[in-house]
Regions:
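Active-site environment of non-heme Fe oxygenases that use a 2-His-1-carboxylate facial triad
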Residues: 1-242
Length: 242
């Protein structure tokens, strides 16, 4: 947990081969975060999906549910099967990309921190939307949250005078999400679970061919407050700074 909080991502190995194994670990840390997709979710190829995650197409790097007032914190994604050709998972540190953008182009960084854009998810059961900036800063000016999801971002509606500059800033950050220097690519194996900070680590996947095998991941979320609370409690009994 300490490494997950520090670096944003860890891999847990040797989970039992059942759908509840990852959830049990998450529940030992804190309460599960319920969303419009339920308390848990299955990432499989579905015939009539309401989310691109439930298809076999490639998913570019993104954070989950930026349309929520407070996006989910830590995601627990347990691989039950990954037999299809393709389907490697992609990860990148959104904080590192933001900090590099700040150093290279302070004006672009400032726009992504100060200007809110619309995010929206809607289907027949929900219509959840919010206006928030891509980058959120803490009291000391440090990056504390990334909201980046091209599929859930709406039409930019800021003042027309800053729109060209904002598009340039957004493209500058997008370019970093496509820069392999920031990326980690791995093909999860059955029995492995990736745990990552959804408000820091962008994730995605390569496309896969469902005719070549089954791909099944099972996931849930635990909010940051629950995660850090458990970490502080554990730190009382071991010599680790929380």
């Amino acid at each position: 947990m300490h490494d997950t909080a520090t670096f944003g991502l860890t891999i847990v190995e040797h989970l039992q081969d059942n759908i509840g194994a990852g959830v049990k670990i998450a529940e030992r840390i804190g309460f599960l975060r319920r969303t419009n997709f339920g308390t848990t979710f299955e990432v499989i190829n579905k015939p009539d999906p309401n989310n691109l995650a439930y298809t076999s197409v490639a998913l570019p790097l993104h954070t989950d549910l930026p349309n929520q007032e407070v996006p989910p914190g830590y995601q627990f994604l347990h691989c039950l099967a990954n037999e299809a050709t393709g389907g490697a998972s992609l990860f990148a540190d959104g904080f590192a990309m933001a900090d590099d953008l700040r150093a290279e182009d302070p004006e672009a960084f400032y726009l992504l921190c100060k200007v809110s854009i619309p995010f929206r998810f809607h289907d027949e059961d929900a219509d959840i939307q919010v206006h928030k900036p891509v980058i959120t800063l803490g009291d000391a000016g440090e990056v504390i949250e990334i909201r980046y999801n091209a599929h859930l971002a709406g039409i930019f509606d800021m003042n027309y005078e800053i729109m060209p500059s904002y598009y340039n800033a957004y493209r500058a950050y997008m370019a970093k999400t496509r820069d392999p220097r920031y990326g980690l690519t791995l093909k999860l194996k059955a029995g492995e679970m990736v745990v990552f900070d959804n408000r820091r680590i962008l994730h995605g996947r390569n496309s896969f061919d469902p005719s070549t095998g089954f791909r099944h991941l099972h996931g849930c979320y635990v909010d940051r407050g629950e995660f850090t609370s458990r970490l502080r409690l554990l730190a009382r009994t071991v010599n680790i700074k929380s």
